[in-house]
Curated annotation (Swiss-Prot):
Family under the similarity heading: Belongs to the RNase H family.
Main location class: cytoplasm
This protein's record includes keyword Cytoplasm: yes
Keyword Magnesium: yes
Keywords: Cytoplasm, Endonuclease, Hydrolase, Magnesium, Metal-binding, Nuclease
Source species of the chain: Shewanella oneidensis (strain ATCC 700550 / JCM 31522 / CIP 106686 / LMG 19005 / NCIMB 14063 / MR-1)
Pfam families: RNase_H
Listed name of the protein: Ribonuclease HI
Gene, per the UniProt record: rnhA
Essential cofactor(s): Mg(2+)
Residues annotated to bind Mg(2+) 2: 12, 136
């Protein structure tokens, strides 16, 4: 059995307004090589961008990997590590019997995460963590670039 590649992934989401124009930023490191990704949407929320960033990163990987995924989003980390299990048991309903917000992205993140061994880590945002700061720059630049792409999942919830 071959050993899985160890990939370090850093993600961040940004939104100007919430809702408003938004973007995500990703920095991926593997054996000294760095790949950056970002994209923006015309109308979305900060939480949707915080979820979309790890989804895009994980979906970009072509094989199962061992991943250390670092984000400044407690919402994303708590959701994928803790809340999602109850949501799935309850048919994607919260403990208050209301539909889970951003369910389209939670389902995508859950599916993308299944292929990998992931250590979900949290870092305080805007605290000088180099990769997190870079993700923030990428996400903010994508949100500020007058994006025209539509976040169809957000539009459906409006």
């Amino acid at each position: 059995m071959t050993e899985l590649k160890l990939i370090h992934i850093f993600t961040d989401g940004s939104c100007l307004g919430n809702p408003g124009p938004g973007g995500y930023g990703i920095v991926m490191n593997y054996k000294g090589h760095t790949k950056e990704m970002s994209d923006g949407f015309s109308l979305t929320t900060n939480n949707r961008m915080e979820l979309l960033a790890p989804i895009v990163a994980l979906e970009a990987l072509k094989e199962p990997c061992k991943i250390i995924l670092t984000s400044d989003s407690q919402y994303m980390r708590q959701g994928i590590m803790t809340w999602i299990h109850g949501w799935k048991k309850k048919g994607w309903m919260t403990s208050n019997r209301t539909p889970v917000k951003n369910v389209d992205l939670w389902k995508r993140l859950d599916k993308a995460a299944q292929l990998h061994q992931i250590d979900w880590r949290w870092v305080k945002g805007h605290a000088g963590h180099a990769e997190n700061e870079r993700c923030d720059q990428l996400a903010r630049a994508a949100a500020e670039a007058n994006p025209t792409q539509i976040d169809t999942g957000y539009q459906a919830e409006s």
